[in-house]
């Protein structure tokens, strides 16, 4: 169940339908979107969330909400912004929409009892925008990531959610009726232009009820995750680059070639691999692997904790991140790519062939 044309299944053409019949096994927060002209179709709003709950996750919070964050752009005539606006330069920057949305709405209002804990499951479904979230300085308790509850909860004043990522947080907004809070997307430097030509965005308003405030106790959530060991793991270099423009076109590359010229990586069924993802470009890249979770071992040589099951992780510019992947099952050909979808369409994609099958040919061309 993957849905990548020419790789895992045929595209679903206009007027056609396709039924997925599958067993739900892994709790976590997921989302779905097309893999045909991804940047365009996701930018136009074709996406949704899929929540797989674990009744035994230990999170006893009554108020729960799923927040799908995104953005959308329009041209001067009020029509959806063309997918190729800005040409090759727009692809390199990663096009962001003009209007930030939450569950398809602009600046919605969420009602809260003062001090009452709420569980926010957050999906970043934007094609390029990073959400660097601040709630008027009030704390977030991060309890989980893409693949469910993480090893240990942690408290922070700001949360970064990059495209494709999911984060599970507890908030206990403090305030009073008539004095709302604002959830904002702060400026985050993901590459040239992402700070210079952008502004802080209001995302959502928290309005308080007149109920008596609650003095909630701090919430601590844990999950036993086996300590990852890189012993015996096969090292795999994944080098992300953006060479100088040629013939007025830019292309991102993995290990020196764009997707339309690349050969698949290979993994034996049951093999453990250590992917050494080196970002040699001047842009951050949210790195996403289809079909498998991974553990983020370290970033710039520094261990990453708490442990969490991830399928998307930001690889900052000029930084190396090591990922431990266990290709334990699910043979077949699987995609990996930057989840800034303009970057993916611009060549920053690849596939890994798991098992002994024959890789499929594709007709993806340089845009």
State where each predicted segment sits.
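Histidine-centered copper-binding motifs that mark active-site loops
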Residues: 1-170, 191, 202-224, 228-246, ...
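Short tyrosine-centred short linear motifs in exposed loops/low-complexity segments
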Residues: 16, 24-30, 115-116, 165, ...
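Residue-level "contact hotspot" at macromolecular interaction interfaces
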Residues: 11, 111, 160, 174, ...
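Active-site pocket scaffolds in enzymes
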Residues: 1-6, 142-156, 237-367
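Asparagine-centered strand-capping/turn motif at beta-strand->loop junctions
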Residues: 122-126, 173, 277-281
């Amino acid at each position: 169940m993957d849905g990548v044309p020419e790789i895992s299944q045929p595209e679903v053409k206009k007027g056609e339908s396709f039924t997925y019949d599958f067993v739900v096994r892994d709790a976590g927060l997921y989302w779905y979107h097309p893999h045909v002209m991804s940047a365009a179709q996701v930018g136009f709003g074709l996406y949704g969330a899929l929540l797989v709950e674990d009744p035994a996750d230990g999170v006893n919070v009554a108020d729960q909400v799923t927040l799908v964050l995104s953005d959308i752009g329009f041209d001067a005539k009020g029509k959806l912004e063309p997918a190729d606006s800005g040409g090759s330069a727009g692809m390199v920057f990663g096009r962001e929409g003009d209007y930030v949305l939450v569950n398809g709405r602009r600046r919605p209002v969420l009602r809260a009892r003062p001090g009452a804990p709420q569980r926010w499951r957050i999906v970043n479904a934007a094609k390029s925008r990073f959400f660097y979230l601040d709630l008027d300085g009030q704390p977030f308790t991060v309890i989980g990531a893409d693949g469910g509850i993480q090893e240990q909860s942690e408290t922070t004043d700001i949360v970064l959610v990059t495209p494709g990522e999911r984060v599970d947080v507890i908030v206990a907004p403090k305030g009073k009726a008539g004095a709302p809070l604002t959830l904002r997307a702060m400026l985050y430097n993901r590459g040239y232009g992402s700070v210079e030509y952008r502004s802080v965005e209001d995302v959502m308003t928290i309005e308080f009820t007149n109920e008596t405030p609650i003095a909630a106790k701090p919430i601590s959530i844990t999950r036993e995750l086996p300590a990852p060991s890189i012993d015996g793991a096969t090292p795999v270099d994944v080098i992300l680059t953006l060479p100088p423009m040629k013939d007025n076109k830019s292309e991102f590359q993995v290990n020196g070639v764009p997707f339309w010229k690349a050969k698949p990586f290979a993994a034996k069924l049951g093999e453990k691999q250590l992917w050494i993802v080196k970002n040699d470009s001047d842009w951050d890249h949210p790195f996403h692997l289809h079909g498998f979770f991974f553990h983020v071992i370290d970033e710039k040589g520094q261990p990453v904790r708490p442990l969490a099951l991830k399928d998307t992780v930001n690889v900052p510019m000029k930084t190396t991140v090591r990922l431990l992947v266990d290709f334990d099952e699910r043979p077949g050909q699987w995609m990996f790519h930057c989840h800034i979808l303009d970057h993916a369409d611009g060549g920053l994609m690849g596939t890994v062939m798991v098992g002994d099958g024959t890789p499929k040919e594709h007709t993806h061309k340089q845009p």
